Amino acid sequence: MKNQSRVLNSELGDFDLSVLWDQILNFEGYGSYCFRPMDMDGYHKRSAGLNPCKHSGFSHSSRPMAPGIYRYPEVKSSLRRQVHAPVRILNSGRDRSTRQGSGNVLGTFLTRNNDMWKRNALDSSLRYRTDREVIDVDDELGDVEMISDDTSREGVENVAMEVDEVEEKAEMGNGLFSEVASLKNGSLRVGECSKANSSSLVVNRPVTDVTSFEAYRKVLESAVNRTSKLKDRGFVDFFKERGRALLRSLSSFWRQDEEPVEVVQREAFVPLSREEETAVRRAFSANDSNILVTHKNSNIDITGKILRCLKPGKWLNDEVINLYMVLLKEREAREPKKFLKCHFFNTFFFTKLVNSATGYNYGAVRRWTSMKRLGYHLKDCDKIFIPIHMNIHWTLAVINIKDQKFQYLDSFKGREPKILDALARYFVDEVRDKSEVDLDVSRWRQEFVQDLPMQRNGFDCGMFMVKYIDFYSRGLDLCFTQEQMPYFRARTAKEILQLKAE
């Protein structure tokens, strides 16, 4: 090897080997590190190693370089070069050498979000951009003749005459073009449309001078079509608004129809105040012979003994029931629109009409319902209530003129067809006697009401009967239960003490 080096040195003469090595080392195929072989000019005693070297920009020198330069080269950051080979992806797509610092990551995050926010703002502004209607007049402008400056006056006059004809047809345009008269000068300028409609009319290219009226006709027809669409839309909006108004009126009507029912039902369960409860307790503890109230029109006196039948566990007597029937009629007279027109017989009516000894006797009760006494005929009422006392049990019979049926209500759900037969016969006789009319009730239905609150003890039958009458006279369903009987007893006592049913 040494002999070969001497021969090579003798053949090359003064050739600088450092230049040759630099050219070899700067070859593009080498990586960031290259192998330094032993030179042939006396440097073979140095051990081989990996030394960093540059790829480009190396300063070539014509002088031999000192041995220490290759062994201890200047450390400089090499320029990164794109790798043309498969690369292993590490740490979520980046190796350790290409990982960014926290500062760069934060800067990249803010920059990326800033760009994203700008794009979103731009997209939102573009999303709500309203496209204007474009009228294409290019197809019909092929035959347009341009009017030159030296156009004869006759041609201009002919154009003006045609404009007059078009103006007569343009009246349906509702004034969309306020400057049509400017066409008489011999040219049509689309830009001369009224500014009020410039936002809704856009031509896709500027048209300056047009002698043909096809463009004008197309623009005018477009305006007319748009006007008709607006009119149609206005009619639809008007129709919708009228429909909404109708629905509002109907809903208000329904509410007006429902609200009184809710108010009346609420009034049927108004609790007693502390003062009223105290007054009722004092009345229940009064002496037996102490007259608490007197109703002058009916001549009924309520003593302490009579009122105590309204205490829980007691049977109702005739005086309390009859006075309460009178109070219900007075309540109806105070507010006739709030309650049904009813007639309330007392507890002695049916025993007079049907006597166990003589049977049915209309003459016994004929004078009970005279016009002079009542001020109205029974046939003009909605309902007629007849309390029925059967030995030790109270029930209710109703002549329902409004619904044309005879009803029987028993808190034990009993049935008494004979009672309804007697009442049907009575009503026919009553109408014939007072109105001289033969009433046919053969088509009227007899109903033994089953859907009603039931009695669960042996003493509340009278209270159930009174509340049947109260709720039916209000036009309400029987929406109460046995548990509310103590409240109804106290309320009835309060109303009797006040001589006013509520």
Curated annotation (Swiss-Prot):
Name the active site residues.
H393, D410, C461
List this protein's GO terms for biological process: protein desumoylation; proteolysis
Which SUPFAM superfamilies does this one have?
Cysteine proteinases (SSF54001)
Alphabetical UniProt keywords: Hydrolase, Protease, Thiol protease, Ubl conjugation pathway
Q: Which GO terms describe its cellular component?
A: cytoplasm; plasmodesma
Main EC class the enzyme belongs to: hydrolase
**Functional description taken from the UniProt entry:** Protease that catalyzes two essential functions in the SUMO pathway: processing of full-length SUMOs to their mature forms and deconjugation of SUMO from targeted proteins. Cleaves precursors of SUM1 and SUM2, and very inefficiently of SUM3. Seems to be the only ULP1 able to cleave SUM3 precursors. Cleaves SUMO peptides better than SUMO-conjugated proteins.
Name of this chain's protein: Ubiquitin-like-specific protease 1A
Give the encoding gene's name.
Answer: ULP1A
